[in-house]
Amino acid sequence: DMVFQNGLRQDYNASISGATERVNYYFSLGYINNEGAVQGNEYNAFRSNMKINAKITDWLEVGANVNFQDRSDGDIQVSLGSNYWDNNMLRNSPYASMYDNNGNYEQYPMSGLPTNGGYNYYFDRQYYDLEKGYTVLNTIFNAKITLPAGFSYQFNIAPRYQWFYDRYWMSADLPNASAADRGVNRGWSKNFDWNLNNTITWDKIFGEHHFTATLVQEAEEHRYWSDN
């Protein structure tokens, strides 16, 4: 079928984990590639995760949780536009020829002419392409210190990076293409966010009485860069 497909879903994962008396860890890798019901509709992502917690001494514990992901965010699928001026492969005649006499894709499969000639996604697809997606690094680092007299201190910081890319081009060699549609579109942006948390806790039991007090300090920042 030139328009629809039996979408294939692929999801692969591998992981390892382990623990000792003082350290436990986990690491995983994954890849996903999903196809939709329409030709050209697809999504893919690569992801990984690492977690580690360690008891360094009787009074110090540290940990880290790191997530990485690179995923697509756009595709160029067969056009099924609903307006009468939109390209739509379903409007082609059953007798339309998608190839010319030399076996190459025919731009106008119903008549070979621009006027009422139909639409061939596969001919046009030779002249444009798209790369669009996100790369994300999410991290959390923490430490806990046990202090005398029932006091403890905990520190958490969570930096997050996100990169976005959008690269599209249409060749001027595409016959009868609109001058406004030809050319290149390039977009890039980066986000950097972080938040941190400092917590001091006092937990003490006096006879039948249990006292708990907590002091918390938090801070965060969001930064954004773009060439658009």
Model regions and ranges:
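Outer-membrane beta-barrel channels and translocator barrels
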Residues: R9, T20-E21, T57, T146-P148, ...
